[in-house]
C-alpha cells in the first residue's frame, strides 16, 4: 500500500531511527562499522512489482521487473532486509549488470558511478501485506516493529527502486554498540 510511504519522518522516531532512515550514502559502509558484515541473496528473479513499487518505478503491475531480495547481516544476524527492483526492457533488466552482482552489495556500483542519481528517501512502518514485511518474516524476523526506507535511483532515465527494512534487532544492536561511544564523549 503505497500511501504508507512518506518523505517526512514518521511520528515517534528516535534520533537514531531518524538518522538511519534518512542518512545519505552507502548503508553497507555504515553497517560495516558496526561489526562483521555479510550479505545473503535470498531471491533473484523476474516477477511483477507490487502496486506501490510499480507506481514508484513508473510502470504497471503487469510489467515484469527484475527483483533481488537480500539479507544484510552483522555478525551473522539479520539486521536489514532489502528488495531491489528494476523494470525489464526487451527481456533484460533496465540495469543489466545487476543480475550478475550475486552476493555483492549494490553500493559499490551505485556510489561510484557518476551518472547514477538518487532520489529522495521515503520511509514507512511496513504492514503484514508489504513485501518487506513478508521478506523479514521469511528470514525469521518478527514483523511487528519494522522500519523501512526506500529511494529510487536513475541512470539514463531507467529507474532502480531499493527498499531497505531495519529489523527490530538492529536497533538493539545499535544501542549496544553505540553505548560505549556515548560514555566516552
Swiss-Prot record:
Listed EC numbers: 4.1.3.40
Lineage per the UniProt record: Bacteria, Pseudomonadati, Pseudomonadota, Gammaproteobacteria, Pseudomonadales
Pathway in which this enzyme or protein is active: Cofactor biosynthesis; ubiquinone biosynthesis
Ligand binding (substrate): 68, 106, 164
InterPro entries from the UniProt entry: Chorismate--pyruvate_lyase (IPR007440), Chorismate_lyase_/UTRA_dom_sf (IPR028978)
A Gene Ontology cellular-component term: cytosol
Stated family: Belongs to the UbiC family.
Subcellular location(s) of the protein: Cytoplasm
Organism: Pseudomonas entomophila (strain L48)
Functional description taken from the UniProt entry: Removes the pyruvyl group from chorismate, with concomitant aromatization of the ring, to provide 4-hydroxybenzoate (4HB) for the ubiquinone pathway.
Protein name: Probable chorismate pyruvate-lyase 1
Amino acid at each position: 500500500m503505497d500511501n504508507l510511504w512518506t518523505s517526512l519522518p514518521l511520528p515517534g522516531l528516535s534520533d537514531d531511527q531518524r538518522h538511519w532512515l534518512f542518512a545519505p550514502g552507502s548503508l553497507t559502509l555504515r553497517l560495516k562499522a558496526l561489526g562483521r558484515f555479510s550479505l545473503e541473496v535470498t531471491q533473484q528473479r523476474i516477477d511483477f512489482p507490487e502496486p506501490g513499487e510499480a507506481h514508484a518505478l513508473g510502470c504497471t503491475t503487469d510489467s515484469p521487473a527484475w527483483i533481488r531480495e537480500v539479507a544484510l547481516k552483522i555478525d551473522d544476524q539479520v539486521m536489514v532486509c532489502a528488495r531491489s527492483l528494476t523494470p525489464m526492457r526487451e527481456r533484460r533488466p533496465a540495469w543489466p549488470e545487476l543480475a550478475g552482482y550475486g552476493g555483492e552489495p549494490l553500493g559499490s556500483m551505485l556510489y561510484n558511478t557518476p551518472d547514477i542519481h538518487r532520489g529522495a528517501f521515503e520511509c514507512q512502518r511496513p504492514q503484514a501485506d508489504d513485501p518487506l514485511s513478508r521478506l523479514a518474516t521469511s528470514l525469521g524476523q518478527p514483523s511487528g516493529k519494522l522500519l523501512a526506507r526506500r529511494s529510487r535511483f536513475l541512470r539514463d532515465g531507467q529507474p532502480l527502486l531499493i527498499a531497505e527494512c531495519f529489523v527490530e534487532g538492529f536497533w538493539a544492536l545499535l544501542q549496544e554498540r553505540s553505548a560505549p561511544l556515548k560514555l566516552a564523549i
